[in-house]
């Protein structure tokens, strides 16, 4: 709701530079939206209003979508680090909110990450799960082994991106004065554990 007061509103008033990066699942990211990240208190944003996979189309501050080539979590962190480095150069405290698109169906992964999960149990190949197709956007049934392999590959890429963020915070001497808060909004579908 546009009338909500966010942490970004409060920290901006306290002198923080506030940025949002990744999945903005609160409303549209276009400039005219009353709930885009800027309207909700962020000075800068590089965001998409839904999940994203490879080559994500991000809007920079409400502009037309621009495709950032590569794996979505890596592109999200690259933009986040640019923002943090700029805040460091300005000697300004910052709030960098990162909402990854991963892990999220229909799932996809980089070949190097998929290869890590080539040896999942064969019995998973006999079971199927229903999820959205990357090709058609429609619901389809796929082997659980294939789906888990892609899901785990997305988690691996996201983990690598978080590691890149942590490493860069240390290199910038910001680690000791920065709070990292991680939570997720995409639990496993119930059929995975059965």
Q: Which role fits each region the language model picked out?
A:
Residues 1-8, 26-28:
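His/Cys-centered metal/cofactor-coordination and adjacent catalytic loops
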Residues 30-34:
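Metal-dependent catalytic neighborhoods of phosphoester/phosphodiester hydrolases
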Residues 13-14:
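Conserved dinucleotide-binding and phosphotransfer motif residues
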Residues 17:
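Residue-level detector of anion-binding/catalytic polar loops
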Residues 20:
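Extracellular polysaccharide-degrading/modifying enzymes targeting complex plant/algal/animal polysaccharides
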Residues 35-36, 45-194:
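Active-site-proximal cap/lid insertion segments
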